[in-house]
Amino acid sequence: MKADIHPQYHETTVTCTCGSTFTTRSTKENGAISAEVCSQCHPFYTGKQKILDVGGRVEKFERRFGRRQPGQKVGGAK
């Protein structure tokens, strides 16, 4: 195996938006990573239903394109 071709691992603290933190190792040099979800708040691990709508994606889509009514046709052919 060649020497000095692999990146250096650094101790890194991962901080979730829920406030929990844990330490791991990473090639990222500044030693800090932020995460949106972790095992403490992810619905799969907690067993609780929670909507993870980051940045209001649904609302942004509805503002941009509007909400269609049933039976309403989409724009005509050109």
Curated annotation (Swiss-Prot):
Q: What is known about its subunit structure?
A: Part of the 50S ribosomal subunit.
- The entry's protein name is Large ribosomal subunit protein bL31
Q: What is the lineage of its organism?
A: Bacteria, Bacillati, Actinomycetota, Actinomycetes, Frankiales
- Is Ribonucleoprotein tagged as a keyword? yes
Q: Where does Zn(2+) bind?
A: 16, 18, 38, 41
Record GO terms (molecular function): metal ion binding; rRNA binding; structural constituent of ribosome
NCBIfam families attached here?
A: L31, PRK00019.1, PRK00528.1
What InterPro entries would the database entry show? Answer: Ribosomal_bL28/bL31-like_sf, Ribosomal_bL31, Ribosomal_bL31_A, Ribosomal_bL31_sf
What Pfam families does the entry give?
Answer: Ribosomal_L31
- What keyword terms does UniProt attach to this protein? Metal-binding, Ribonucleoprotein, Ribosomal protein, RNA-binding, rRNA-binding, Zinc
Q: Which family does it belong to?
A: Belongs to the bacterial ribosomal protein bL31 family. Type A subfamily.
Per its Swiss-Prot or TrEMBL entry, what cofactor is needed? Zn(2+)
* Family matches, as PROSITE patterns: RIBOSOMAL_L31 (PS01143)
Report the source organism.
Parafrankia sp. (strain EAN1pec)
Q: Which gene encodes it?
A: rpmE
Keyword Cell inner membrane (UniProt): no
